[in-house]
Structures are given as C-alpha cells and as structure tokens.
C-alpha cells in the first residue's frame, strides 16, 4: 500500500522534527521512524510541484511551468498534459485501488476578477475546469476535495465528490479535519480487502488564507509575538549549541537587510 501526504506551502522549518516552535508530534513520529532529507530540490511553487510529484517529470514537461492558467506557451499551458502519465494511472493498470483526498490544482482554473468573493464555495456550482482533467479522469477511482488552489477552510470553493460539486457543508466544517476524516475512513475500508491501494492525500493547509481553529489560534498566539528577529537569533543560538554551526560570533556574513 502507498500513502502520499502533501502539505501545501509548508516551510522546511515549520515542522518540529526540523526545529520549529510549532508542535507537530505525529509528523515528528513519522520522521523519527522513517527517513528525513537534509538536502533536496523541488519545483518551488504549489501546482508545478504537484505536477512533478504525480508524473515524475519536470513541471514544464507536465504542462504546468508556472500556474494553472494558460500562458499559450509549450510547458505553460496550465493543465496537466495528456502526454504526462500519472502515478495513479500506472498503479490502477497494475491492479491498485486509487484514491485522492484533497486539493488538485493541476487543471486550468483561470483567475477571475471576483476571485476574493468566491473563496467560499457557495457562490456558484459548476464545472471548475474541464471534467476530463479532474482527478477521477486521471487515474483516481474517486476524489473528495477541491479543484482550485485557494479556498476558504470553513466553506471551501470548488469542493467536489468525483465530478459532482458539493453544494453545502455542515456546521462546524473545517477542511483540514474533513480531509483527514475522509482519508481515515477510506483506509479502513481498504483494509477489509487484499487489493493494494494508493492514496494521495493533499491538504490545503497551511496555504493562505491561513484559517485556523480557535483552539489553535489560542495555543500559538504568543509564540511569534517577539518578532522574527528574536526567533531567528534563538534558532541560531540553538544551532550553535547543537554543533550545527561553529560557536563563534563571526561565522555568518553580515545581513543584507536591517530592521
């Protein structure tokens, strides 16, 4: 079985296992029991990374060199190319059950003037991109999640079940928790069968608009109150104590920018 979990715009230093002030015990446990990278490259932005991850190709080869709108240039068409085979398509042909839960954002979804007004999904319900580019038509047996890249966490725009728009969400809905619950439910169902499964779990968090639950806001509201310079100095001192940097004052060059 294969489970791929993707966070959205998560910083390298935002995880506890890499020294963050934010508590991430479950991810830290995964890191401790698995492999942590200390040197790697990626494609920098959200949707190009998704295109590369799902196809094994450079983002331009996959058709998404920048974002999900058509720049009318090869490699910049804003939609996952039909010449780029997804891992879901390959595994499905190999006998795997395939599921996607979460954010797609590799089909052309043009910017609109009223974009900020329709972050909440209830503004309209229609096809958010050509259906042939939806996850269920690119190798996934099913998909619960969003097509667009930016959504309201409490009332997400472009939320779909397969090809069908989800017209309303219950009171208290929070997409991060909803995606987790859906993934857990599906994994439990897969466990009843001997057929191998591939799940791609792609969260919308922590991408803007940075919507958090009240209890999480309360927990961290003072964590960075002292400002980024104080946090930077504290991290640097900790790195010296751990022997990552030599314990000397002039090891780093002068900063380019000052407060």
Q: Residues of each region from the PLM?
A:
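Formylglycine-dependent sulfatase
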Residues: 1-259
